[in-house]
């Protein structure tokens, strides 16, 4: 094992034997990795605060040579505790959904500084009550590509042609529909919703932060993202399943809400 220094966001903490913990972080230098923190459960441990879930910390570790093997913690220094996340159930749920995506077993073991920056910004914003719900939505949207996920927002998904105007976003197939391809029995969508999706697609996690937020649109987008991650990509996320128990996400309520929001200003 070689000794290395990393900065990481703590994603998971698991008790191991009586006094030890297994900590999983997403780091700036190596992506996702896990290490054993010996004695971390002792009251006298100097590493306690740096190991709390959602904390941002500097770590010195003895890194395993194998990517998915357990490394060993030498020291941890807290940079930012993000403890306010735990004071709000909703914010804790939002942050947990983000961490559950990165904790998928076979992914994120390589260095990706853009993802690290995005994760750090999302966790900080949720902690600081800076559009916490939107930061979760944006993180999920901009992480789709890491799973090979894709929503067609540049052309009609049916005829594969670009159009100046689109009549709807197909909520089942995650793609835009042009005037030539929409069926007579289909409802057209509010053009502002279509522009909202396209604006997200044309920006990044960081640049989208400066634009006005439409919470009604983002409630719909969040439900679509949860369904896409769970059903199309096939990930397992306990916090996603928990948030889907909220009344607004229940099928009857959601589709009634969606109809009301998306058919208000169609072209």
Swiss-Prot record:
Protein name: DNA repair protein RecO
Cited InterPro entries: ARFGAP/RecO (IPR037278), DNA_rep/recomb_RecO_N (IPR022572), NA-bd_OB-fold (IPR012340), RecO (IPR003717)
Keyword terms: DNA damage, DNA recombination, DNA repair
GO cellular-component term (any): bacterial nucleoid
Lineage: Bacteria, Bacillati, Mycoplasmatota, Mollicutes, Entomoplasmatales
The keyword DNA repair is assigned to this record: yes
NCBIfam families with a match to the protein in the record: reco
Similarity annotation: Belongs to the RecO family.
Biological-process GO terms, alphabetical: DNA recombination; double-strand break repair
Residue ranges crossing the lipid bilayer per the database entry: none
HAMAP family: RecO
Top-level lineage group: Bacteria
Purpose: Involved in DNA repair and RecF pathway recombination.
UniProt keyword DNA damage present: yes
């Amino acid at each position: 094992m070689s000794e290395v220094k990393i900065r990481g966001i703590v994603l998971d903490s698991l008790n191991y034997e009586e006094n030890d913990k297994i900590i999983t972080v997403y780091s700036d230098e190596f992506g996702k990795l896990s290490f054993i923190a010996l004695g971390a459960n002792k009251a006298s441990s100097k590493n306690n605060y740096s190991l709390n879930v959602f904390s941002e910390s500097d770590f010195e570790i003895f890194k395993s040579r194998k990517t998915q093997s357990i490394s060993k913690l030498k020291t941890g220094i807290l940079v930012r505790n993000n403890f306010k996340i735990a004071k709000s159930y909703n914010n804790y749920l939002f942050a947990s959904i983000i961490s559950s995506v990165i904790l998928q077993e076979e992914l994120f073991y390589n260095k990706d500084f853009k993802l690290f920056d995005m994760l750090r910004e999302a966790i900080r914003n949720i902690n600081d009550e800076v559009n916490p719900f939107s930061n979760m939505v944006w993180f999920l949207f901009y992480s789709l590509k890491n799973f090979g996920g894709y929503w067609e927002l540049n052309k009609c998904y049916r005829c594969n042609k670009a159009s100046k105007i689109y009549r709807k976003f197909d909520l089942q197939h995650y793609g835009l529909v042009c005037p030539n391809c929409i069926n007579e029995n289909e409802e057209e969508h509010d053009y502002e919703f279509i522009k909202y999706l396209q604006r997200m697609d044309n920006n990044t996690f960081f640049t989208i932060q400066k634009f006005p937020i439409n919470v009604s649109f983002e409630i719909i987008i969040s439900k679509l993202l949860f369904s896409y991650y769970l059903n199309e990509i096939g990930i397992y996320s306990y916090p996603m399943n928990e948030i889907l128990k909220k009344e607004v996400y229940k099928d009857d309520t959601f589709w009634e809400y969606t109809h009301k929001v998306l058919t208000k200003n169609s072209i």
